[in-house]
Regions:
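Short glycine/proline-rich turn/loop motifs
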Residues: 13-16, 147-153, 226-232
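Conserved small-residue
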Residues: 1-9, 107-108
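Intrinsic-disorder/low-complexity loop/linker signature
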Residues: 9, 132-133, 216, 226
Length: 256
């Protein structure tokens, strides 16, 4: 048996897998794009910005039908408008926000535990994915099998969290030189809101255990079954917050 582990001559019954290398890619794709537009007239200035950021996960898809991998997408936007209502009155409107979607494997635990179990996985606990089937070691042939690197996440679905954040500022800046030169009044109001919702997509995947036949061929004993994704939300699957802010100031700036 030790020779088969060493020489990898029987990778089904006596596997030897580095689960980090088997489950994860060396790198993941990341992209960022931004567009800015600015302009205006004598009485109005504007600035508009939009951006997109994407980050793929490092897990290999292997034979899974659903995309369980880590994934992050963010779309951000901003628009600033300064308008001279009169020669002494400036009105500014600033709108900004972002929409982000984060997907994580549905392991039933926090993500730190997922990676710990991947590092703790036993090299001979399974043969990985063979002909589209997840194969785990047979305890009849090995005194100890433990858990393979796929046990904590593979074929269990994913969680998708969407967050929407909006920030709005309205500013009025009024010169009061008709009272005294250098005097001005500023009024600012802000509204901030955030809303998030989480969707859970659960599934299951059958596990196969290799069995050695008398003629030397290998068959598989099936445990469990494959199921399609089913979507749900838990009681803590959404949340929102909002706040208002108001500020008023009287400023005086003058050189004598």
């Amino acid at each position: 048996q030790l020779i088969k582990f060493r020489d990898h001559t029987d990778p089904i019954l006596y596997p030897d897998i580095n689960w980090i290398d088997y489950c994860m890619n060396k790198a993941a794709f990341q992209s960022q794009h931004n567009v800015n537009i600015s302009g205006g007239t004598d009485r109005m200035r504007y600035f508009v910005s939009a951006g997109m950021f994407t980050q793929d996960g490092m897990f290999k898809q292997l034979a899974a039908s659903d995309n369980f991998n880590f994934n992050y997408k963010r779309y951000n936007y901003r628009a600033n408008l300064d308008f001279d209502a009169t020669k002494t009155t400036l009105i500014s409107v600033n709108i900004g926000g972002r929409i982000e979607t984060k997907r994580t494997p549905e392991s039933g635990e926090d993500q730190n535990q997922l990676f710990r179990k991947l590092y703790w996985a036993v090299p001979f606990a399974g043969a990985g994915i063979v002909d589209g089937k997840r194969v785990v070691s047979n305890a009849d042939y090995l005194p100890f099998t433990g858990s393979d690197g796929l046990n904590s996440y593979y074929g269990k679905g994913f969680r998708s969290t969407t967050t929407n954040v909006l920030n709005v500022d309205l500013v009025l800046d009024q010169k009061l030189d008709f009272i005294t030169k250098g005097l001005s009044f500023k009024l600012k109001g802000s509204y901030n809101t955030s809303y998030w919702t989480q969707k859970i997509a659960s599934s299951s995947m059958a596990v196969y255990t290799p069995v050695l036949h008398d003629d030397g061929s290998i068959g598989y004993r099936k445990s469990g079954s494959d199921s399609q994704l089913s979507y749900s939300r838990n009681s803590n699957g959404e949340g929102k917050s909002r706040d208002w802010y108001m500020e008023a100031a009287l400023n005086y700036s003058r050189k004598f």
